[in-house]
């Protein structure tokens, strides 16, 4: 594609990178990413994807901005309190990069709409704060054949992972899905939420930025994919660990004899 002078200036630091260049930046401008959740992780994720020039960003969230969100959800402002999060995020992203198309989905993702929501996107990024939605998004991405970059955070601890179990190599081997790591969601109430246990706001920014980096790498096809690995962050200890994870042959979703054939198990 031919860049305008403004685009050359806006994306100059990307174009200078040998691994990106003009071809890579053009690929980003054609790319489509769905971000599930416009909260603590979704905020920095959306900001950096928009700044990077990802051409189309979808935002799924049914919540409204609350004062308690602003300690970490930096895509929203005090003036946006009471507004739908998807609309607040769209306004902020337009101010950062008006070239980006932002599609708002003011709804809760569920088994009845998940496949339709993710169908029009290349990569899905999950920044939600509950196990039920993480399992749903994982299952939906597997069935739809979409790469999923997911993150989770609580208190001072976080995890980031990429799942693309739908892609097999020439030997038929594939990476893990979320269910290969955690077979089922824990009983409701067993693991506290951020609203119950708290979360360090700045850590959301760091982890969301790392998640954005992994999304950009997947879109560009550069670097080492996190598929097959799990990054564990200890904010208090200032440590990162990269743990190898393998596909589980007994996984009920992507294993050798899967028992999950659709999203019906997620129905209320």
Identify the role of each PLM range.
Residues 1-268:
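Adenine nucleotide-associated cytosolic modules
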